[in-house]
């Protein structure tokens, strides 16, 4: 999205991104609502995504939707609706597991299964990834190697601040390419 000012200054680029996950999948609820019970909770995504897509269309805004594989598996038509509206569909992992809770093998399987499912649904390559809760932190640089090996071209997981459970304080604040085992 590009916005211009009335005073003649150059336009500013904005990135509009959405994490597509159910309300009961956020980390704050992980001890109250285990994954084994997710399917028993009512979905609120269909209405929310439809409303958001209508609003974005009205304002001629295009964005990237980081879709959880679990959601895509249960609501493939919602994922198709996002793609048909001209938005990018990217991966948010499959199970909403934070990267720092997984081994490299588990991380690879999670991103691989999510990417394959999303590509099957939308019929086009999925090149973007965002870890749940911005959970790629210092010490997890191996995640970038795996993302590159699995065919991702960019990552949107780094939050350049320090917080208790997320943040990568020395991360670049501008868009940049990911490389092998470095940020």
Residue ranges and their predicted role:
Residues 77-78, 101-108, 138-143, 147:
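Metal-dependent catalytic neighborhoods of phosphoester/phosphodiester hydrolases
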Residues 24-26, 73-75, 97-101, 136-140, ...:
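Short catalytic/ligand-binding loop motif for oxyanion handling, primarily in non-cytosolic enzymes
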Residues 2-88, 130:
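Active-site beta->alpha N-cap acidic-glycine motif
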Residues 98-120, 180:
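Alpha-helical scaffold elements lining the catalytic groove of polysaccharide deacetylases
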Residues 18, 91, 154-156:
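Active-site flanking residues adjacent to catalytic metal/cofactor-binding acidic residues
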Residues 2-4, 120, 124-127, 131-182:
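Active-site-adjacent pocket scaffolds in enzyme catalytic domains
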Residues 89-96:
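Histidine-centered catalytic micro-motifs
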Residues 48-52, 78, 110, 114-118, ...:
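A general structural detector for well-ordered alpha-helical segments in enzyme core domains, enriched
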């Amino acid at each position: 999205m590009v916005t211009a000012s009335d005073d003649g200054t150059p336009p500013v680029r904005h990135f509009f991104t959405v994490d597509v996950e159910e309300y009961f999948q956020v980390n704050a609820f992980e001890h109250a609502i285990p994954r084994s019970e997710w399917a028993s909770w009512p979905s609120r995504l269909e209405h929310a995504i439809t409303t958001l897509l209508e609003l974005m269309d009205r304002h001629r805004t295009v964005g990237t939707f980081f879709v959880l594989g679990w959601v895509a598996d249960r609501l493939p038509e919602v994922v198709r609706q996002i793609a048909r509206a001209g938005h990018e569909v990217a991966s948010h992992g499959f199970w909403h597991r934070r990267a720092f809770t997984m081994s490299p093998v588990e991380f690879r399987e999670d991103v691989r299964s999510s990417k394959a499912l999303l590509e099957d649904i939308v019929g086009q390559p999925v090149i973007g990834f965002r870890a749940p809760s911005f959970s790629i932190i210092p010490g997890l640089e191996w995640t970038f190697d795996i993302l590159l090996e699995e065919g991702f071209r960019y990552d949107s997981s780094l939050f350049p601040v320090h917080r208790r459970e997320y943040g990568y304080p020395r991360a670049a604040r501008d868009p940049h390419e990911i490389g092998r085992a470095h940020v």
